[in-house]
Amino acid sequence: MKKSSQPRNTKQRRHTIMQLLQEQGEVSVEQLVQLFDISEVTIRKDLSALETNGFLLRKYGGAILMPKEIIDENDELTKRKFVIAKAAAERIRDHNRIIVDSGSTTAALIKQLNLKQGLVVMTNSLSVATELRALENEPTLLMTGGTWDTRSESFQGKVAEQVLRSYDFDQLFIGADGIDLARGSTTFNELVGLSQVMAEVSREVVVMVESQKIGRKMPNLELTWQQIDVLITDTGLSEQDKQAILAHGVEVICV
């Protein structure tokens, strides 16, 4: 195939990469750079995005097709996280300054941000930061720094809190290990200080959580209902539990 015949559109280019993977089983960054006549940085972003969506596995210098045995198309929990993340992304406007806390549900939000322009994103998660770097719209990335906590796989501590307090944000997107209907969001992690500061410096606090966690009381209270503005969950939320949350003055979105 000639370079001039290759698609410049991101969607078309990634489709062509997948076609090549189907035919060859693997591709190299060098091969794709020559084929599309674009930068290595752009190709690496393409491969990262395709890996994030479960289509391939990156390796040194290229990528291979995702082995069928590790593809789980019926992962209902993953689907729930995706629809919750999509609903959360719809609340984000161009040029917003947002915080994305660590966690698998909040991490799913990053994939939805590619069409947003001029975003500033603060995170305490290396995995979230890595996914942000793969976005073509290249949002401004800020990191809290601090002490690495192996349990939550995120930065915590006083340094991280001080960094956060030097900024202000439009929105915080945060997950939860459980939702106590009487008190608020709960977590296994005893280190809740950073979550408190994240909420303090954000004008809107959005909790993203799957419905099976609602009613589940973890040992540590993370955010009270008074600190939460919006809760986004899936349609598995019962009407009784929804009314209990609404009674705290929290907006509830079921998707």
Show the residue positions of the predicted features.
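HTH-adjacent hinge/linker in prokaryotic transcriptional regulators
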Residues: 2-30, 34-36, 40-99, 103-104, ...
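Conserved phosphate- and dinucleotide-binding cores of soluble alpha/beta proteins
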Residues: 2-21, 26-32, 37, 52, ...
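Residues at secondary-structure transition points
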Residues: 67-68, 109, 163, 181
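Conserved SAM-binding loop
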Residues: 99, 121, 187
